[in-house]
Amino acid sequence: MAVVTIRQLLDCGVHFGHPKTRWNPKMKRFIFTERSGIYIIDLQQSLALIDKAYDFVKETVAHGGTILFVGTKKQAQESIAEQAQRVGQPYVNQRWLGGLLTNFQTVHKRLNRLKELDLVDFDDTTRGFTKKELLIQRRERDKLEKSLGGIRNLTKTPSAMWVVDTKKEHLAIDEARKLGIPVIGILDTNCDPDEVQYPIPGNDDAIRSVALLTRIIADAAAEGLIQRHQKPDAEGSAPAEPLADWERELLEQGDAAKAALPVEENDVDAEVSAKNEAKSDDEVPAPVHAPESDDATEAKIEAEATEAEAAPATTGPVSE
């Protein structure tokens, strides 16, 4: 079942692209037609790619991963914060700080500082701080809250990243590519589809379009959270994150080779054992005589004993 219909995409204006003068030739395969100098995006392809991205996000979250929502343009700030908070995922809807992913250790120290300042009562002057010092700390906290408030609970780099407007968020995409973090993003007709692993062709400028696509990704994360909590955790181990494509292929090849080896051995063993049984049946000689009864055996023993008694005993040394 599709997570969204073409009618919903049309109503939100997802199909509207940029004017012909602002386009990337790499997006040609996603363009349906051109009307009044504006490119129209092929929503059939968008629908299929939405389903693919939805499944990826759901599986990522179900296996314990996190999705970082990124959208700093005005049209996306509200929906990014709202949907990310709804499903408990980190988000960045203000300015992207350089090194937020590639220099996460330093960012994590600032997050700890933010948590320390959250515990400070700025109206209490009886703790040894002057009013000026409390005012400076309050301003520091407000600044950190604005820039890092959305990722305060992020303890490691995210498993994947949802991006609105890949051209504007090029710094975030560059850092994600350096760390091998998959990117799901809205691709307008002026974007480069090679920059993201899970592209969704659509309008990244209209508020309704951005809100709809962001809500779909959040719904996928919510479904993944439900699956994560429903999974029995008998061993008490932390859920594993999804494997990379090359790791998955390597694992499948190893499983296939391991499964094929016992089957071949079993076939050979069965064939050899069948031959041995047939050969043993042919080589077993027929019995020469029937086994003697107990009475016949006793009579034979008595006869041998009588013959031994009747034989003369030898006395003295035997002459040479």
Swiss-Prot record:
Residues 272-282 have a biased composition (Basic and acidic residues). GO terms for cellular component: cytosolic small ribosomal subunit. GO terms for biological process: translation. InterPro entries: Ribosomal_uS2, Ribosomal_uS2_bac/mit/plastid, Ribosomal_uS2_CS, Ribosomal_uS2_flav_dom_sf. The keyword Membrane does not apply. Residues 254-320 are annotated as: Disordered. It comes from the Bacteria. Belongs to the universal ribosomal protein uS2 family. NCBIfam families: rpsB_bact (TIGR01011). This is Small ribosomal subunit protein uS2. It comes from Clavibacter sepedonicus (Clavibacter michiganensis subsp. sepedonicus). The lineage of its organism: Bacteria, Bacillati, Actinomycetota, Actinomycetes, Micrococcales.
